[in-house]
Amino acid sequence: MPRSRINENFIDKTFSIVANILLRIIPTTSGEKRAFTYYRDGMSAQSEGNYAEALQNYYEAMRLEIDPYDRSYILYNIGLIHTSNGEHTKALEYYFRALERNPFLPQAFNNMAVICHYRGEQAIRQGDSEVAESWFNQAAEYWKQAIALTPGNYIAAQNWLKITGRFE
């Protein structure tokens, strides 16, 4: 049974109903509809922590989806799963790929910054301040891009940039 038919929580049900209505009234190809169904099922599985199932759905959505903008969100969600699994190198790769298709994803820049900041903290714990500084500088650049896209967001990042002298 497709995941879209077994959603149990109110928000998932509401999203599924609205999505199904939109799929019926908006002119789309059958491939686009199938891609969206896989994407929606991937989001549902991801929200329940079923990452393997979510990835299968996202990969199938990627195979079917041709629109770069829509593909950017699929890639972003794949990046989220890899981040959750601690696979930071893979996550960064997917965030980069998402941004290639849609450079207006502040959440991708933010997540990349968080990973770089985390790696900077790891380097400090390992006693390598030079490597840490490099990671922190990279985090700063990504946070600046996220903040430029959504100036009212990422207040903690803005504060970190100011405290560390990286805010221009």
Swiss-Prot record:
Keywords: Chloroplast, Membrane, Photosynthesis, Plastid, Repeat, Thylakoid, TPR repeat. SUPFAM superfamilies: TPR-like (SSF48452). PROSITE patterns: TPR, TPR_REGION. GO terms for cellular component: chloroplast thylakoid membrane. TPR repeats lie at residues 35-68, 72-105, 120-153. It is found in: Plastid, Chloroplast thylakoid membrane. Pfam families: TPR_1. It is a peripheral membrane protein. Its main location: plastid. One of its GO terms (biological process) is photosynthesis. Essential for the assembly of the photosystem I (PSI) complex. May act as a chaperone-like factor to guide the assembly of the PSI subunits. Belongs to the Ycf3 family. This is Photosystem I assembly protein Ycf3.
